[in-house]
Design a protein with these regions (language model features):
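RNase H-like, metal-dependent nuclease domains and their acidic two-metal-ion catalytic environment used
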Residues: 4, 10-251, 290-374
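Short alpha-helix plus adjacent loop in nuclease-associated cores
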Residues: 248-296
Length: 374
């Protein structure tokens, strides 16, 4: 990398031998400009960051001017983002300080002994396209419920997946957007994290079929359903043709008898309508407010408890997301669909109960003839 952190060349913190003074020295050090240095560059930087925590734009400007990581150098103004950049960058900074290998595992899924539609196993692999923070215990892996000969996910109570798929294996020039898959857990009482993203996949394998199979294996291994875009239906046909239609969630904003013929056949949600776009963005926004960065008002958790979103690539995608030009934000699309999948009850149409009015004709019986009461 050509990036050099600011502390290696910050004016006023270079000693007379040309070496940077990172931390506050026990004794004053003579600087290259013949001035005494009594404070470290990193200590100065950390104090400035602490003093600017309440002003998101000023903090991002300071990060851009004095970057310690590559992500600092490309910070955006919070006004330009749809989501809460302060929380997103708090989480990114926290993640940067972690030893990633202790929290995330890169790997691949494969069918046991190469036999499809049996059991799926996860294997750590430095070349794998999956990044996971949690795998279920043995008794929760590969849980499938069979109803009337159809396969359904056995861990729907634990979480769900969201997917931004593609239909064409390759395009001229080798471009094209990535396929993306995210897994997130619900609040649960099992031995699993709650409201936490546990899987990230953002890649474009050599063929679309490889992508479809990898998505299918992830769903089978975790035993969780998937909410995918049905604008690009090949992934959903792959699930249906292999007997996993029960894993593909129907769009949560419509009752079953209001679904189109294709939606009943394949499931999925059209991610092109304005209502769905707004619901999708609101789902991501709500998740960020509740589970990313610090909760300074202690509304959802303790003030000093950091959020649990460990996938920095997705965080960076959220920071740049443009709702009017969504094509290149694969990670945001799939992660938003995953959040919608675990809170589908929020999008279900309300049943309008109408009172049945039964008007019986009533008569007043006085005299020889009865009289209709109006």
């Amino acid at each position: 990398s050509l990036f050099i952190p600011m502390e290696w060349n910050m004016e006023g913190f270079i000693d007379r031998y040309g070496f940077p003074v990172f931390r506050t020295p026990t004794k004053e050090v003579l600087g290259v400009d013949d001035e005494m240095i009594d404070f470290g560059a990193i200590d100065y930087w950390e104090n400035e960051v602490q003093s600017l925590k309440s002003d998101a734009d000023a903090l991002n400007e300071f990060y851009r001017q004095f970057p310690r990581t590559e992500s600092h150098a490309f910070r955006d103004e919070s006004k330009a983002s749809l989501f809460n950049l302060t929380k997103i960058y708090q989480q990114i900074d926290y993640n940067d300080a972690l030893i990633t290998d202790h929290h995330l595992t890169r790997g691949s899924f494969r069918w046991l002994n190469g036999e499809k539609d049996t059991k799926v196993v996860f294997s750590p692999d430095t070349r794998g396209r999956f990044l996971v923070s949690w795998t279920p215990e043995k008794n929760l892996q590969n849980r499938i419920i069979v109803k009337n000969g159809k396969k359904y996910p056995g861990n729907e109570h634990l979480g769900a997946f969201g997917c931004d798929s593609y239909d064409i294996s390759g395009v001229v020039g080798g471009g094209g957007s990535n396929g993306a898959l995210h897994g997130v857990t619900k609040f649960n009482m099992d031995n699993a994290p709650s409201n936490e993203f546990f899987l990230q996949y953002v890649a474009r394998p050599q063929t679309a079929e490889i992508f479809f199979e990898e998505v299918l294996m992830a769903c089978v291994f975790y035993g969780m359903p998937i909410l995918a875009e049905n604008n690009k239906p090949r992934l959903l046909y792959h699930f249906k043709n292999r007997g996993y239609r029960g894993f593909s969630m129907n769009r949560p904003d419509k009752v079953y008898n209001k679904l189109s013929k294709t939606e009943r056949e394949l499931g999925g949600i059209p991610n092109s309508s304005e209502d769905v776009k707004q619901s999708h963005a609101s789902a991501v926004e709500s998740y960020i407010e509740k589970h990313v960065g610090l909760d300074m008002e202690s509304t959802y958790r303790d003030k000093d408890e950091m959020g649990s979103m460990l996938f920095t690539r997705t965080l960076e995608d959220w920071a740049k997301f443009d709702i009017n030009n969504r094509t290149k934000y694969d990670a945001t699309i799939s992660s938003g669909l995953a959040v919608m999948a675990i809170q589908k009850h929020l999008y279900q149409p309300q049943k309008i109960e109408s009172k049945i009015s039964v008007n019986f004709a009533r008569y007043r019986n006085k005299g020889i003839y009865s009289e209709l009461i109006k």
